[in-house]
Amino acid sequence: MLYHLLYPLAADFRIFNVFKYLTFRTIYAVITALVVSFILGPWVIRKLEALQARQVIRTDGPESHLKKSGTPTMGGILILASIVIPTLLWADLTNRYVWTTLFVILGYGLIGFTDDYKKVVEKDTKGLSPRQKMFWQMLIAGGAVCFLVLVAGMSTELSVPFFKRLHPDLSYLYIPFGMLVVVGASNAVNLTDGLDGLAIGPVAINAATFLLFAYIAGNAKLSSYLQTPYVPGAGELAVLCGAMVGAGIGFLWYNAYPAEVFMGDVGSLSLGGGLGILAVITKQEMLLVIVGGIFVVEALSVIFQVGSYKYRGKRIFRMAPIHHHFELKGVAEPKIIVRFWIITIILALVAISTLKLR
């Protein structure tokens, strides 16, 4: 919005020329997201408490979690506001990739909101059924990926980390593959959101990493030099990624141990879906497995646990997802959280290193 209002004035007032620079608008998207979080945060928490939108704690989980009972949830509403407002203010709103990403983030946020509202406000313990959630997740992801491939003409080739000349073309199989990336990322982040600040930290780190890759993907010279896929217009996603980083840090202010508010499904599903569609648009789908390694491990721990118990009658972990396994082994919650953040930073650096290690 500000881009469209103020940049045209650059012809008469040179100061407004700064609005053409992605770096300037990205930095201020981060700052705006932080400001929105700090201004709206206390108000959102009070409203959630008034709605009695309080987290229900599993009785079969770690005993230390019982004291969290009654903490407001659905704080993902604050995250969404802190992403959408800066994006609308600082991004080029004629960019199709910005709107596609917002469509996925808000669509998945609506799924999570509906599930959370049924569970914590209407006291319907079932919420949305797994089938219902999966249906809507697949529908939204399918709509977004079909638009990108069939309308926007996005390449269906894959970029394989560490191999600069390996670009397998999936053709129309790319559509179900892209859907899998978005849905998988969404649910993986959802499974990770089990400790105070555990999910939002890695999400912010992932968003910062994709900020860099979006900027490179949208720059013809940089993408050619680094031999990464060139996606005209993808650079504008750096602004949205900046908003995600700011929103993540701003939410962490309230979600850090001991948490004042939880993000709920409205936050975890939307953030995961956002990371997934960012990976698809920037043509770094496989890189998401590296930078989002914590989310991958969390999801795999649940899959292996369920599979092992179903077919062998034995559990691999004391409890899944794996962060609960470490809790039951006696590792303090804050230590688990910070260690997972550190691992994510290392994985992000490895992901960035693939720009030259080819």
Swiss-Prot record:
Indicate whether Cell cycle appears among the record's keywords. yes
Name listed for the protein in its UniProt record: Phospho-N-acetylmuramoyl-pentapeptide-transferase
GO molecular-function terms, A-Z:
metal ion binding; phospho-N-acetylmuramoyl-pentapeptide-transferase activity; UDP-N-acetylmuramoyl-L-alanyl-D-glutamyl-meso-2,6-diaminopimelyl-D-alanyl-D-alanine:undecaprenyl-phosphate transferase activity
- Organism equals Geobacter sulfurreducens (strain ATCC 51573 / DSM 12127 / PCA)
Membrane spanning segments where?
25-45, 73-93, 97-117, 134-154, 172-192, 197-217, 233-253, 261-281, 286-306, 335-355
EC numbers on record:
2.7.8.13
GO CC terms, sorted = plasma membrane
From the UniProt record, give one GO term of the biological process aspect.
Answer: peptidoglycan biosynthetic process
According to the UniProt record, which cysteines are disulfide-bonded? Answer: none
Q: What does this protein do?
A: Catalyzes the initial step of the lipid cycle reactions in the biosynthesis of the cell wall peptidoglycan: transfers peptidoglycan precursor phospho-MurNAc-pentapeptide from UDP-MurNAc-pentapeptide onto the lipid carrier undecaprenyl phosphate, yielding undecaprenyl-pyrophosphoryl-MurNAc-pentapeptide, known as lipid I.
